[in-house]
A protein has these predicted regions:
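N-terminal, post-signal-peptide metal-ligating segments of extracellular/periplasmic oxidoreductases
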Residues: 34-76, 134-239, 245-247, 335-374, ...
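Histidine- and aromatic-rich segments of cupredoxin/plastocyanin-like copper-binding domains
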Residues: 227-243, 249, 325, 329-479, ...
């Protein structure tokens, strides 16, 4: 990822030394740093530096005097932001500036801040964090605590063998005040209805395309499910044209047996437009129930909550911003594509200012002081959420998105990247009359891109209630395939191209070409694959259509929460994960790709074929 030319950094370093000489000290091996200064009074203005190969702000704590300005110098080859963690009454950061690689910028809004300490971070690399101290200020702008003003909406549930959803534009309540937000929806809501299917019984879902003309042709992928290639939401074929419909057939079986109880989600998967179409609202949840899970005395009914966590940014009129309007320019065509201009790899990050749950910003939900089942889904286009509860109580994880674990795992934090899911039990007993906040906190492991810090939603705990649920010591987990000793295929995730001709996200050195098969495997065979990240950024790798076992992570046994079935894995820089599956039932082309959706759209996808 650091293959970009270093000339920009060298030139900007020279510029900084000339233009910011009073504020910078270049002595020693520590790189550029802000001079402490001999004055007792706080400086009126200050400079913040992001160094080449930047992973920190220098200095980590910077002080600005009343009415002063904060200048940011980015010597790195990545774009970065300086974004306030605290927000105003609309949920917007108190300050937020993007600083392109090899440039400088002034952080607007600092001069109006009241005295105090303000945490900030990089939206694109959340492990980068710092503190701004404002002194001697006459400003009155300060942080507003998140109010949790609107109730959580649980999407309506649709059951039955035949489901019909109209993809149409609709106005959706996302923010607590002001106009509703216009979105592209499945069935008029965001998220779309939660589809519930019975394992072993075919579910037929018809999608009718009535979205505006600019939506173009669409395709729907049932993420995590096992089905035929024609039903997989192919990125360039089997498309749904405007005014037309298509029925997808999901048998909900694997190898002739019913699929295990699962928590999938459905979303648009159109080539080059996946990030845009998901951002506009084409997402929904899908639950598979089986006989074994129904016999368990897990929380059910109103105490079984599917929660889709994502993020969006809004205009002053509560409409979605369009982060794709000024996107990069594609050079060439699929198979040889590269991208130039702003937002080209590795600076392609669709990050929202507001975290939303089931489509609403900062919702609250009233619960009794009993056990609840939370089905947690990260449907964000880029960000990871490291989830915890504000009072320190644990999650008891009973499953992944693809089935139950063999034994429950007690966790105080759940790090979910894009497309990852966790099935957990939370016991709210002992908290009557209290509020418990589900929050995302910085990840202590800073090897990768990191997780954003933000309140997610609030649980308002009421009185105790009768609770018949139980937490089994052992769960009916699906059988795992026996993994071969040898690796059949290695998939390497990195960046390709150069600054002059354009860059692209690559798998095994190549951008995606829908007409090229990068691996062929026999129907009925069992293969062990290695997923390897040689870039400087975390990726979340998703493999379509099979039931995958995590064999090892960096050569060692995976952690307990990765010992069930999976379809999406976190890969930090330098990591590798071995996975294995039996290629059952269906032949044809399937996809492997990064589920950071801009990465997928900008080349980090490959095709493999199952053949007879």
């Amino acid at each position: 990822m650091r293959r970009r030319a270093r000339a920009v950094a060298v030139l900007v370093t020279a510029f900084v030394l000339a233009a910011f000489a009073p504020a910078l000290d270049t002595g020693g091996d520590a790189g550029l740093s802000v001079r402490a200064g001999a004055q007792a009074a706080a400086p009126r203005s200050a400079t913040l530096v992001i160094e080449a190969r930047g992973s920190t702000y220098v200095p980590a704590t910077v002080t600005v005097g009343g009415g002063g300005t904060l200048t940011v110098v980015n010597l790195d080859t990545y774009d970065h932001t300086v974004t306030s963690t605290a927000v105003d009454e609309r949920g917007e950061p108190l300050f937020d500036v993007r600083v392109a690689a090899g440039t400088t910028a002034t952080v607007t809004g600092v001069e109006a801040l009241a005295n105090g300490r303000y945490d900030y971070h990089c939206r694109f690399h959340p492990f980068m964090r710092g503190v701004l101290v404002v002194e001697d200020s006459t400003g009155e702008v300060g942080a507003d605590p998140v109010a949790f003003e609107q109730p959580l909406v649980v999407p309506r549930v649709v059951r039955g063998a035949d489901v019909r959803l109209v993809m149409r534009q609709a106005k959706v309540r996302m923010l607590p005040r002001g106009p509703r937000t216009t979105m592209w929806t499945y069935g008029g809501s965001y998220p779309g209805p939660t589809i519930v299917g019975r394992a072993g019984r075919e579910s037929r879902v018809t999608f009718v395309h009535r979205l505006p003309r600019k939506a173009g042709a669409l395709t729907t992928h049932l993420h995590g499910d096992h089905h035929a290639a024609s039903e997989d939401g192919q990125p360039t074929t089997h498309l749904i044209r405007r005014g037309r419909s298509r029925t997808y057939r999901y048998p909900l079986t694997y190898g002739g047996d019913p699929e295990p109880a699962s928590f999938f989600f459905y979303h648009d998967h159109r080539m080059d437009r996946t990030a845009r179409n998901n951002w506009r609202g084409l997402q929904g949840m899908f639950i598979v129930e089986d006989a074994a899970s129904r016999r368990l005395r897990l929380p059910k009914g109103r105490r079984d909550l599917p929660l889709m966590i994502s993020e969006r940014s809004f205009t002053r009129r509560n409409q979605l911003t369009d982060p794709f309007a000024q996107g990069p320019t594609m050079q060439g065509h699929h198979g040889t594509m590269a991208f130039t201009g702003p937002g080209s790899p590795p600076d392609d990050h669709t990050v929202g200012s507001h975290v939303v749950v089931n489509g609403r910003y900062a919702p609250f939900h009233r619960v009794s002081a009993t056990r609840y089942r939370l089905r947690l889904l990260n449907a964000a286009p880029f960000s990871a959420y490291n989830l915890s509860l504000s009072d320190g109580r644990p999650f008891v994880q009973i499953g992944t998105g693809n089935g139950l674990l063999r034994t429950p795992v007690v966790r105080t934090q759940l790090n979910l990247g894009p497309a990852q899911r966790a099935d957990v039990i939370v016991d709210f007993s002992g908290e009557s009359g209290q509020d418990v906040v589900l929050q995302s906190v910085p990840d202590a492991d800073e090897r990768g891109t990191g997780s954003r810090a933000a309140p997610v939603m609030q649980f308002r705990v009421g009185a105790p209630a009768r609770d018949r649920s139980r937490l089994p010591a052992r769960l009916p987990s699906p059988d795992l395939v026996t993994a071969p000793a040898e690796v059949s295929k290695t998939w390497t995730f990195d960046i390709g191209g150069d600054e002059r001709h354009g860059t692209f996200w690559a798998i095994n050195g190549k951008p995606f070409d829908p007409g090229r098969s990068d691996h062929r495997t026999r129907l009925g065979s069992v293969e062990r694959w290695r997923l390897r990240n040689t870039s400087d950024m975390t990726h979340y790798v998703h493999i379509h259509a099979q039931q995958w076992r995590t064999v090892s992570r960096n050569g060692t046994r995976p952690p307990p929460w990765e010992r069930g079935l999976e379809d999406t894995w976190r890969l930090d820089p330098g990591e590798y994960v071995d996975v294995a599956a039996r290629f059952a039932d269906h032949t044809g082309p399937f996809m492997i790709h990064c589920h950071m959706l801009d990465h997928e759209d900008h080349g980090m996808m490959a095709r493999f074929d199952v053949v007879r």
